[in-house]
Amino acid sequence: MKSALCIALALTWSLLVQAARQTVLAVADHDIGGYSTFLQSLTDRDFDVKTSYIKDESAKLFEYGERLYDNLILLSSQSKSLGPVFSPKSLLEFVQSGGNLFVVAGSQLPEGIRELGRQLDMFLAERQSVVVDHFNHAEGSDDIILLDGISENPYIISDETRAAGPILYKGIGHYLGPNPQTQPILRGNPTSYIYNTKTEAEVSKNPWAAGTQLFLVSVLQSSTGERVGLSGSIDMLKDEYLSPQSPSFSKSNFLFARDLTNWVFQRKGVLQATNMTYGKVAEPLESRNASCYRIKDEMIFSIDISLLEDGQQTPYVADDVQLELIMLDPYYRVNLVPVPSDSQTSQHYEAVLVAPDHYGDFTFKIEYKRPGLTPIEEKSTFTLRQFFHNEFPRFLPHAYPYYASCFSVLGAFLLFCGIWLLQKPAKPVVPSAKKQN
């Protein structure tokens, strides 16, 4: 009996752990065995990794309208099409349903990836193009270039990666449109440019893109937090550069791939807002978040914000988190103040304000968006009412002049009446009679 109970508990625990792990589907159009180090690094970070062939008819992203995977990696270097399962439309639906997508393509990329990039405002160069640099390259090859134009955003790329040295890159490039949700992670050198090996001579006179406006790795984050990564180098993730046993091992490439996948798969740079409360100052916590308050009440708003870093919750401390109190237009826009608390996983913020002298439906709203961080959009609606008849003060300060005039008129009237009543009337003068002769 005890052994059966132990087995049942063990199975239940394993299922819970399995459910908590993020699932990753790695899809390739070629032998995926050359990415064993990269895929193993995902497994070491507690991702549940599965692999598939890009034209496998049994592969699917959805079942009964539900997304089957949390994250998708698309590795394409030789196929001319993505197949029906992984078409640009299906990939966009996967992202819109809450999934994260990491696209890695080489110079022989299919047109479907270029179409997907155009949908995201990431414009990839033509097939058979390659990025070259005649001044910053690995020994013996102009198309294996050394790059140090790494993003300075600390929420995406760590200081350790930036200090590890230049990135080895061999592949295609792209440029970005005006979409504010996209940002470059790896730029070209001032001497880098795109070269089409099929249509151009050994040196391109009019390159498609060049210099620091040539982007090699870029990311996109939607307004609801879904993330997409795009890399133009399929070789960057191969064992040739990521395996410590390889003579071409690059620590900077290994760290770069780790940071990039951690961000795209939402293991870092994820903000979470919890415990949003509001109420009157000195009101018990259990009485907060009521549906109705009174105008001119002194109110307090509080919220806890945490930052996910390498899968661990940490306090997020900032001085630019703003709170708005809105009824059509903001009545207040104030900065939330970080307040010390006992929590080791989140930062407590507070703001104190006086409710407007205007009744109606109001909304507390926080809208916080920063590059590299998932957006925070929290709001709660409540009603502000007028004073009840027994809540008005006995005397209003603004009415003091009217009170004074009223009492002064009353006093003057009483004084007049008193004077009039107390004043003795004068005796009438009787004229004397004239003597008769």
Curated annotation (Swiss-Prot):
One Pfam family in the UniProt entry: OST48_MD
Tagged with keyword Glycoprotein: yes
Topology feature Cytoplasmic, residues: 423-437
Species this chain originates from: Schizosaccharomyces pombe (strain 972 / ATCC 24843) (Fission yeast)
Family, per entry: Belongs to the DDOST 48 kDa subunit family.
Function: Subunit of the oligosaccharyl transferase (OST) complex that catalyzes the initial transfer of a defined glycan (Glc(3)Man(9)GlcNAc(2) in eukaryotes) from the lipid carrier dolichol-pyrophosphate to an asparagine residue within an Asn-X-Ser/Thr consensus motif in nascent polypeptide chains, the first step in protein N-glycosylation. N-glycosylation occurs cotranslationally and the complex associates with the Sec61 complex at the channel-forming translocon complex that mediates protein translocation across the endoplasmic reticulum (ER). All subunits are required for a maximal enzyme activity.
Transmembrane annotation, as ranges: 402-422
Name recorded for this polypeptide: Dolichyl-diphosphooligosaccharide--protein glycosyltransferase subunit wbp1
Main location: endoplasmic reticulum
Domain notes: The cytoplasmic C-terminal domain contains a functional dilysine-retrieval motif, which is involved in the retrograde Golgi-to-ER transport of the protein.
Assembly behavior: Component of the oligosaccharyltransferase (OST) complex.
